[in-house]
Amino acid sequence: RNTKGLNIYAPTYQSHYAFRLAVTALVTSALYEAGGEHPNVQDALKESEAYLLEHLPKLRRATADAMYNVWAHSYGLQALIRLRARALAAKDAPKVKRIEAVIATQFDRLTRYESVDGGWGYYDFRLGTKKPASSSISFVNATVLVAFDEARKAGIKPPQRLVTRAIAALKRQHLPDGSFLYGEYLKMAPRRGINRPAGSLGRTQVGNLALRLWEDKRITDKVIVDWLDRLFARNEWLGIGRKRPVPHEAWFQIAGYFYYYGHYYAGLLMDHVPDKDRPRLQDHLATTLMKLQEKDGDWWDFPLYDYHRQYGTAMALLALHKCLRKPEK
């Protein structure tokens, strides 16, 4: 409706249900992390909590070939973990129990929609089977693994089989130069533009983060810092796709929606860089994002129906929150 009719494939209402829930979850996490204690923020969190608790358990894939719901289950988990912490702080035991029940449904859906190859994809153009034959997609696997780590750290154990298979699938797509394949279906074309370092720039941050969280020793401090430096030094390889309405039309087949996604996970990596590197990397990230804030205060990178301003702003805020200096003791 704000995109001049240039929109991505979204069959049946469940596609938009998935978009809406994923974006609501991201905004919920952003408000929780960066919104402060203002009454309006607390009211918004109450409303989003009620929406997520009611609707996340109802979400399914849209059709046999379109599974955007995997994004909502992943970002939904991250929001639910934060809402659970909020309920624990308020000593609201019934609310904690209800949130944990919904978390269990998200584990169930991610089990149900896991690719036969391990990990997840959001399209199954192969067979459209009950157990998806979708190609395992590197950045989807990494996104889910980051959410699973948050659950694990909150004392809620994700299904081990899913974790093991997703890590294996992500490692299969990790190239010797540090890039990540877009998806396993491209394993026979590792030097195609989209799979080269510039094409992987928005994916490598989340891939590095996921493997680091799940204790892959190859993801050293140096690897993380080098790829963050590349993100800032070569930012326009990613930025040239920003706001272009056709997915993958930019250099190295980069789609616009990787811009704030990549910077969001770059923000999360700030917790994993050496103290000596953190201030300059935080400054690079903050400067990069603040220069791109729109006149009305939001951020967006790809015209996705009516969801782009919300998800872009949420990801930018979550990244900027990680750029704040910790007060000196």
What are these model-predicted stretches?
Residues 1-329:
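Preference for long, amphipathic alpha-helical scaffolds in soluble/luminal domains
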